[in-house]
């Protein structure tokens, strides 16, 4: 349910402005820091957000377990969440940032007017979508054939749809701040949502043991939290939106470029979001209507259900666990590097800099370092999550209505997702590289191919594997998509996306990750042989072993990425 400045001689300390090209502003912004500095800032704030998110999920799991109310609530929250990713954190911000960056360099006042127009357009579009969505829900509610789970899902959808324009506005305003070198407010805003949901769930459980009533209180809290998030981001962004003055004639060109990029991006991201939508819909409609049944009826046909009641909730809670390392590290790095890539792509190489690639050396260096850091973080995260999935699931969720059997179900799904945490991280970075080059069509075509593969695998694997088959399908499609993006980016740049130093770094990262598998993987068995079966103890021991083993392996292999991260500083050349 849920949402990243250094001496000018450093090629990675990318300035968003060229002081020689325009008069000095009365209130100049500080010199920009490296994307790695921003990435660590965002990672820290995202970690706080994800930790409060895990606390929220622990409360929800204790209240609802893997039951029909949890399924209905998460399906109801799916629509606004999908549109948040589509408009707020996806297509609009990806189309907006490169054009806003260019306009800000040339004319800050025009950039402010451009941002205001985009905000107004986003509000209008999402407002219309809410009205249409509420009308559709009302019409669906008139049908008498819904089960209790279906009726609750429609109710929660109706309550939470107004969150859609609020959270999209929050994500867009965060994008404005990113271009101005402020990554903190956007990364920290989800904490408000998490705290509001925790408070509502606690209140609902304390005042009523009726699960549907408690879920309704949480749904209302989601909308109220969205209002708070938007108010905070607007207050933080207002000086960048009010500096432009009247008149919009000088924004026509960037608006046109944004609109031309937005179409393919919307299609590409909409196609990609279909993966999450179809996963949830399959889990919802192919599950029995209540826990005491084993069959389900669809389109008039009754058959043995391939998944159990609570499949939607199980998917959501498993996704939270793999999204924690992905959001804290992978997406944080991709978010921070995007403005740097956009600025580098806008800077054409000089005659002396031109080589085999039409892009500036700064763009290629930034991309290569991003790839190395992404792998250095995400590959061991994949291995670690796979190894700690069972004690982690038990520690986070197993209490109240969430049983041992529920832990086993969610952990099995986490295993499928964990196989491709590194691929998800690469997808975010590589897609942003294409967007920085004003190419939205290639990611669209790649997304179409990946979705087709994912849907095919969903229908094939859900029957023998159940809900874990949906996670495994997503992981396989993500690996396929990451390799396709690498291939097409290599062709587009007319130069090596994975030069020798990057390939050598990737190989050493994989070796270091394999080296942590032995101590981390053997610890549970060793502790259990000593009669120590506490999930908390096993998880703590595995985490400590991993935190010691991987840096030790990286040091033994002389990997500079560890130093980059610890010092929050990148070298001038790789």
Regions found by a protein language model. Name each.
Residues 13-574:
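Membrane-embedded alpha-helical bundles of multi-pass transporters/translocases
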Residues 1-5, 9, 24, 354:
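N-terminal amphipathic/hydrophobic targeting modules at extreme N-termini
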């Amino acid at each position: 349910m849920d949402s990243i400045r250094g001496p000018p001689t450093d090629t990675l300390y990318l300035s968003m402005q060229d002081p020689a090209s325009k008069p000095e502003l009365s209130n100049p912004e500080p010199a920009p820091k490296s994307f790695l500095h921003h990435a660590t800032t965002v990672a820290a704030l995202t970690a706080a957000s994800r930790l409060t998110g895990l606390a929220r999920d622990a409360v929800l799991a204790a209240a609802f377990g893997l039951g029909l109310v949890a399924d209905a609530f998460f399906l109801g929250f799916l629509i606004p969440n999908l549109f948040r990713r589509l408009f707020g954190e996806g297509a609009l911000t990806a189309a907006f940032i490169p054009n806003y960056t260019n306009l800000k360099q040339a004319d800050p006042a025009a950039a402010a007017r451009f941002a205001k127009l985009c905000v107004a357009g986003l509000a209008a579009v999402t407002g219309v979508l809410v009205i249409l969505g509420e009308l559709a829900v009302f019409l669906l509610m008139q049908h008498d054939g819904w089960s209790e789970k279906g009726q609750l899902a429609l109710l929660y959808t109706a309550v939470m749809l107004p969150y859609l324009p609020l959270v999209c506005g929050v994500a867009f305003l965060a994008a404005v701040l990113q271009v101005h070198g402020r990554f903190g407010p956007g990364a920290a805003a989800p904490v408000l949502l998490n705290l509001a949901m925790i408070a509502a769930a606690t209140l609902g459980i304390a005042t009523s043991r009726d699960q549907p009533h408690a879920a309704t209180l949480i749904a209302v809290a989601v909308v109220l939290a969205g209002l708070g998030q938007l108010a905070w981001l607007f207050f933080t962004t207002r000086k960048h939106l009010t500096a432009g003055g009247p008149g919009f004639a000088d924004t026509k060109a960037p608006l046109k470029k944004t609109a031309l990029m937005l179409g393919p991006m919307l299609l590409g991201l909409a196609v990609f979001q279909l993966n999450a939508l179809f996963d949830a819909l399959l889990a919802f409609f192919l599950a029995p209507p209540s826990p005491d049944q084993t069959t389900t009826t669809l389109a008039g046909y009754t058959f043995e259900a391939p998944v159990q009641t609570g499949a939607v909730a199980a998917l959501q809670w498993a996704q939270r666990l793999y999204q924690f390392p992905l959001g804290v590290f992978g997406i944080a790095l991709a978010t921070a590097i995007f403005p740097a890539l956009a600025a580098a792509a806008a800077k054409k190489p000089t005659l002396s800099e031109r080589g085999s690639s039409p892009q500036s050396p700064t763009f290629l260096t930034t991309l290569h370092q991003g790839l190395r850091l992404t792998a250095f973080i995400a590959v061991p995260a994949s291995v670690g999550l796979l190894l700690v999935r069972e004690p982690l699931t038990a520690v986070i969720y197993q209490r109240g209505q969430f049983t041992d059997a529920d832990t086993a179900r969610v952990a099995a799904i986490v295993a499928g997702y964990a196989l491709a945490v590194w691929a998800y991280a690469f997808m975010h970075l590589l897609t942003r590289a294409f967007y920085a080059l004003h190419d939205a069509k290639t990611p669209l075509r790649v997304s179409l191919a990946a979705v087709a593969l994912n849907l095919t695998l969903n229908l094939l694997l859900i029957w023998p594997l159940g809900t874990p088959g949906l996670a495994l399908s997503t992981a396989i499609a993500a690996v396929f998509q990451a390799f396709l993006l690498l291939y097409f980016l290599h062709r587009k740049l007319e130069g090596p996306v994975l030069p020798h130093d990057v390939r050598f770094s990737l190989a050493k990262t994989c070796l270091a990750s394999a080296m942590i598998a032995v101590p981390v993987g053997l610890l549970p068995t060793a502790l259990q042989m000593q009669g120590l079966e506490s999930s908390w103890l096993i998880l703590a021991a595995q985490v400590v072993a991993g935190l010691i083993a991987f840096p030790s392996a990286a040091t033994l292999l002389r990997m500079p990425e560890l130093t980059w991260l610890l010092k929050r500083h990148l070298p001038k050349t790789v």
